[in-house]
Structures are given as C-alpha cells and as structure tokens.
Curated annotation (Swiss-Prot):
Residues 585-613 are annotated as: Nuclear localization domain. Transmembrane segments: none annotated. Residues 1-52, 246-645 are annotated as: Disordered. It comes from Leptosphaeria maculans (strain JN3 / isolate v23.1.3 / race Av1-4-5-6-7-8). Induction: Expression is induced during mycelial growth and at 14 days after infection, corresponding to the development of pycnidia on oilseed rape leaves. Residues 124-230 form the HTH APSES-type domain. The gene is stuA. Residues 18-52, 317-330, 469-481 have a biased composition (Low complexity). Residues 586-597 have a biased composition (Basic and acidic residues). This is Cell pattern formation-associated protein stuA.
Amino acid sequence: MNQMQPYADVHQPHMSTAAHAPASGPPAGLSHYSYPHQPSMMQPQQQQHQYGGQPTGYPYAYNNGVPSQLPASSSMNNALVPSTLQLPAMSAGAPNSSMPGSQSYQSHTFDHTGQVAPPGMKPRVTATLWEDEGSLCFQVEAKGVCVARREDNHMINGTKLLNVAGMTRGRRDGILKSEKTRHVVKIGPMHLKGVWIPFERALEFANKEKITEQLYPLFVHDIGALLYHPSNQTRASVGGAAMAAVDRNRRPDSMQTQQRYMAGPTTSQAPSLHHHHSMTNSVGSAMSQPPHAIQPHPSSGRPSLDRAHTFPTPPTSASSMMGMGNQGSSYEWNGANVQQHPQGNQPLSIDTGLSNARSVPTTPASTPPGAVQQGIPYGSSQSYDGSRPMYSAPPAQPSQYAQGQPMMSYRPDNAYPKTEMAPPSRISDVPEEGEVKASDGMMPQGNEQVAAPPAGGEEENEYTHSSAPYNGNRGPYGYNPNGPPGPMHADHTHLSPEMTGSPHQNGSGRATPRTATNGQAQWGSSYPTPQRQAPPSSNLYNVMSDPRGAPNGNAAHDAYQGPGAVPQYASQGYAPTNGVNSSGKRGRDEEDAETYRPDSVQGDDMGGLKRRKTMEGGAVGQTYAQDPSPGLQRAHTLAAQRARR
C-alpha cells in the first residue's frame, strides 16, 4: 500500500537501474522501460530466474517475499493492472511486462514459445494425480476451460486446448483425428477426457489459434517450479481462496492504481482514497469522481486507505453498503478534501461524491426515493383503489353514479347493441338487461378492471360490475336524454336504496321489474337516442363510470338497481336496441340469472359460476356479447323481464 505512493518513484529508480534490475523483483516491473535497450541481455537472465531451478527467477517480480511481493507485485501489477485496463497504450510500452523488458516486447509481438509470461500474467498452475495413467497432471485454466498437461510425457489435452480457442466441435474433432500421435481418453475426470497430443503439436495449435499467452504457463518447460515455488503456491497452486485473499490485499493498490491511471496517474498518493471512492463510485459513476477525488484525496490518501481496504472488495457485492457507507465517507472525505484542498475540483468531487453516492447506493439510497416516488404513484393508484372501495362502500352513491355516468357508459353499450341489433325503439323496453350482459361482454373488461376492487369473485364481480355499470349507465343514460332521468333518478334513488337495502344483487333482474315500469317507459322513449348519443360519451363515461359504476361493483349493482334497477333491466334497451326479440335467451338467463345476476352482482356463487363459465367460454364479459345470437338472448331477456313484470 505504501509503495503505491512511491510507485512512481519505484518506477523511476527502476527505470534508472533497470539494467541492474534483473536481480531485484521490483525492477522487473520497470524493466520494460530500460530493457528496451537491452532486451537480449535481460531475457536470458530473467528467463533463468523465472524458469530456472530458482523459482525466485519467475517470482523475480516477487523476490521480496510473498507479503512484500504483493506490494511489489501490486506496484508492478499496478503498472500491469492499469496496463490491463489501459492495455492498448500501456502494453504498447513495455511497462506491462512484469518480466524482462525484452520479453515484454516479445509478448507484445506475441510469444510463440509459451515460456514468457504475458504482461500482468501470474502463473496459476494446479496439479492432480491421474491415477489411471499413473502420472501427475498440471492444469492451467483459460477462459473457464481447464487444460491439462502430463508430467511424464508432457502430452497435452488437445480437446480442451482447442476449446479454449473457441473452435467448433466438428473442426476440433477433425483436427484431432488427423493427428498421428494422439492418445484418446474416454474415462476419467472431465478435464482429462479427450484427445491428448504431443507437447510440440499442442504448442503449434496454441500459436496458430493465438492462445499461447492465455494458456501460460501451460507450455513453460519447468512448469513444476512454478507449481511448487512457495510464492506461487500461495498465489496460484493453493487455489482460488489464496488468490482471492491476495487479490483482496492487492486490490486496494491495484484498483487504486488502475483508477488512478484512469483518473489521472499524477497523484499516486491519493489512490487509496479515490480508489476507495472510485471503487465505490465505480459502482455508480466510478470514473467521474476519481479525477476530482484524486486531487483532494492525495493529502488524505492514507486515511482513505483504511476505508479503501474495508470497502474495496465490497463495492460491487455490497454496493448498497458501499453506497451508504460511501455516501457518508465520500461526503466526509470530500469535506476533508475541500478543507485540505479547496481546489475547484473538490467541489466537483463533493458533487461527484453526492452524485456517486446517489448512483452507487442506487439500491439503498435511491430505493427510498424510488419508494417515495413509487409511493406517490402507488398512492395515486391506491387512491384509485380507494375510489373503488368508495364505490363499493356507498352503493347508493354508486347508484347515483350509475344514474349519471352509467348513463354515459350505458350509451356506448347501447350504441353497440343498438347499431348491431337495430330497432332503437324497442331498446327502451327489455334489451337493457340482455344488453347489459352484451355490454358486459363489450365493455366489462374496462369496467371489470376498474371494478376489480370488489374482492368477492373478482371475475364475477368484475363481470357483474361491467354489466352493472352498463345496466346502470344505460338506464340512467336513457333517463338523462329523455329527461325522465329525473323520475329515473327518483326511481333510481328509490331503487338504489331499495336495491342497496335489498340485495345489491341487482336490481338487475328483480329490481328491474320493481322499478322497471317507470324506467322502462323512460327507456323506451329515451333509450334509443341516448344510446346513439352514448357512444361518444360512453367511452369517456365508461372510463368514468368504470371507476364509478364498475367500482361500484357492489354499488354499481346498486346503481343498476337504483337508476336502471328495474327500468334498466326491464328496459335494458339492449334488446330493443339490438333487436326486439333479442330477449329470448336473455329472458331465460334473466329468469334463471336474475337471481343469478343479483348474485353475480354481489359476487354470489351462482352468478360467479355462471359468469365464470361465460368467462371460460370466451372473453370476460364478452360471453354475452359473444353469443352467436345476442339478439335472441336479449329478446329472451326482454321476454323474461316482461313476463316477470
């Protein structure tokens, strides 16, 4: 971590001492700078160190010992890691190579020997005993594929090798089948199955597919040294846990250096802080703040290191934690930075901190705002629901709504049957009830949705609601245009109390006869015109009435009873509008369903079952409208209503 600050210094001395660096691990990272001049000299030595019996040669960059290696490697990796981030530019300059500068150039040109570690690449080798073959197998993972190499004859699993290249199965198998020397393994662990080919052929394939560097150190001759070297054991052979721990230790540095490079390599001291922030910010808007944070943080870099250590790994997984913590920390640090460096950038850093905190903790921080915002919409939606309960709660009022708006909505319903069925004159008498269902079929969906609030058998209620608002709407509609609306309203009011007092069930069937006389007459006169008038307003009113009439789910039914309770159903001008005789089926349904319909309005089982059946049979509420002979149904309904009357 401390090296991070001297990191630039480290590079400079190493650059100056690069010629001497080969022996010292740190110089290797910098060796790329000076080595370009002496690539040939350094390469043999470093290779010896790397791959020679001296494992230190390879860890060459890690000579300082594992703990120090991490910083050293981190500094090198920092050079390397940033290079990985900015690999195009960084790699273009040898800096990427932690190994000899000459090799770095070779690696950039592409190493065909497999002996040179690509820039920033660490040897990661594991070994397992292949009991069936009686040999150790060295395993290197690349692109999620484990490629194995035998220790005794150094053959390599060509199948897995070509899988790393992303080769198709057919092409891979064709190439492997053409190999003269091959060993097919069909039994054993998955990573050992496949066609094994000689080391030289495997290297040729790797070079041809340009995956040699990705497979490093699979082709290193003394791969065992990499495996068994203590530093490498802790880093590579030990496994993911060790690597994860090492990464955690290195991450503050490497991440800091990376972001430092990205943000601005000028302040090597700051990395800790803005890494801390930049990492957290990286979650939200990583790059935006680091530049600002870098300058302010340099002075406060150390303190931030602690936080950086605590935060660096979490940010991604604990973005919410990071966001919250970072918000606080970013604010604090920004404030501190402001005090320390009241530069123009610091306010930016503060702002960025805020914005980053916002963006970073999007989950925690923004969720409350999101929740609030959503709460507002939810509130509105709830209020909408509230409107539904209101409709359902005060059925009498719903009847009023039905009287007023249902008339409007009724128009559209009537308009549909009217246009379809025809004689508007008769519409006034019976059709309404038949049509209510038809309209239910037509309109109910919207109403149902609106009316959905009534909990009991939403389908039924909704369906009923749709019919009810339609009935109510239709009835009041006719009344409104005729001016009978007054009497209708009176009837409606009477009906609505009666209906509400009596079963909300509807005045649809039963109430219709009771109040139908007035309403029917009114319907007869007014219904045709209102129906025609209704369509334009019906859509609007349906929207309106859906909440009012449909939401009335219960109230809507009351409203049906109230405004059109008897008159609507009796007059349910659907049959007249649709056709005089449309009531036939409807009448039957009404007879059977009048009880049913009130029930359905109430969400009773019979109504619910019937409506459910209709819903199952076809679109919700459209079942009536969908009936092949809506006119007949309405006629039946009219006949039944008339008979009852």
